[in-house]
């Protein structure tokens, strides 16, 4: 379980949120919503331990995140707004970098992400959407329980969004957790996703 307890965050003397508390249990996924500058990416960075709140605490499995950082990161898949891949490597080589023990599974993961036939193409030669798919192919490889995804559908077509949404649904059905930001609808998942709306100084579930 991931828990945010009474989080407070300020940027440039502006309060993004105050008194923000919520939990994400096994089998749940949460969509963080809000306008530009509402603090969506900032919240995800706090939840992953990449930044510290100005007040409050994040807990993982009942322990303060700052005390269990190593075990937490072994349970976390974080894909930020930037794909975080190496453009000089091929799609296959990028996945091998993150998942060196899964060589036999890499082609299938890339195919699931819509990159069949592009396995050995240098990432620098791929489109923005294809580069995004290289990063998202990790969803078919990771064993992490918690997925935190910042705008995962950027530059992804409708069919790709549907396929990725099905993968997230399968992960939560198996007891995993997903937290994501997106401006796009989640096809077939509208009734199962919990929404956390950042409203500028507060939030609502």
From Swiss-Prot:
Residue sites binding ATP per the record: 34-41
Subunit text: The complex is composed of two ATP-binding proteins (CcmA) and two transmembrane proteins (CcmB).
GO cellular component: plasma membrane
Name of this chain's protein: Cytochrome c biogenesis ATP-binding export protein CcmA 2
Function field: Part of the ABC transporter complex CcmAB involved in the biogenesis of c-type cytochromes; once thought to export heme, this seems not to be the case, but its exact role is uncertain. Responsible for energy coupling to the transport system.
GO molecular function: ABC-type heme transporter activity; ATP binding; ATP hydrolysis activity
Reaction(s) catalysed by this chain's protein: heme b(in) + ATP + H2O = heme b(out) + ADP + phosphate + H(+)
Location in the cell: Cell inner membrane
